[in-house]
Amino acid sequence: MDTDNIQIEDSSFRDNQGRIVYFNNRILRVVNKIGKKNLDFINESGLLDNSVKKNFLIKTKLLNLKDLPNFFSKYDNVLESEKIPFISYPYEWTFDQLKKAAIHHLDFQIYLFDQGAVLRDSSAYNIQFIGAKPYFIDLLSIKKYEEGEYWIGYKQFCENFLNPLLLGSLKGIQHND
């Protein structure tokens, strides 16, 4: 297989569990040893398939490493995600889109709590729209919930969603001005 078509996404450097890789017009996420345990939990618990079926998570599937070029053999797992037709950013969204994204994020978080899981962060950049529908795109942000654990993404949710929505609705200050 041709490895000339492999490009690592520079902006995915912050994720200590894996990286985004473009290969033959496909979007792949390579998962390292740090992310393997987490991905095993997500997959074995049914969260991967069920989160996709419930339209919380963008369509994502595990790939067989044997079907990929040797470049990928150094990783523990490789995931493929549905390609998003148009990438948008929170600072480009309307007030209503930010509100939809926030509600989607909270609905997904509540679903995950019910399944014994939690989101480790609450970045608005983990949401993308396909048409008017928001989808969560960062599978490895899901982790097993530890009893008594505080929602570690709460502060980031307030910064990325709640505060801009409050300022917009109460004071007319738009988050994207």
Label for each model-derived stretch:
Residues 17-42, 91, 95:
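ATP-binding glycine-rich loop module of kinase domains
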Residues 27-28, 33-35, 64-65, 126, ...:
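Short, solvent-exposed loop/turn segments at secondary-structure junctions
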Residues 42-55, 94-120, 164:
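Conserved kinase catalytic-core helix
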Residues 84-97, 108-109, 120-124, 139-147:
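Short acidic, glycine/Ser/Thr-rich loop/turn "cap" segments at secondary-structure junctions
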Residues 118-172:
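Catalytic activation segment of kinase domains across protein kinase-like and atypical kinase folds
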Residues 174-177:
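A conserved mid-domain beta-alpha-beta active-site/ligand-binding segment of alpha/beta enzyme cores
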